[in-house]
Amino acid sequence: MKMYTRIANQNSYSYIKRKRKDVKYIVIHFTANKGDTAKNNADYFATGNTRQVGAHFFVDKKGDIARSIRLNRTAWAVGGERYGDYKESGGAKYFRKCTNENSVSIELCDCND
């Protein structure tokens, strides 16, 4: 297991500092990219990301962890709109409760075997 720190470019997070005590939720997503790694994702978000998306941490199958955004910053990870199928999928239970501002985002890498 290795730990990396590779801070994402400004597109991925808010530069305004937040207090860690304001964090109430942990959001876990998966990248859906077969074979990707924590380090590769952190490298991409540090140099190649042009969209307003990001995550605080990436974790891969080997157990490697890459920190991409400091915990006192807000990652653009949760989104702002409900998906159209939220009633069927059971999603949106935390819509407007869990936000970018009050959550830490973790992306799981290569977990779609």
Which residues fall in each region the model found?
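Active-site-adjacent loop/helix surface patches within enzyme catalytic domains
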Residues: 2-113
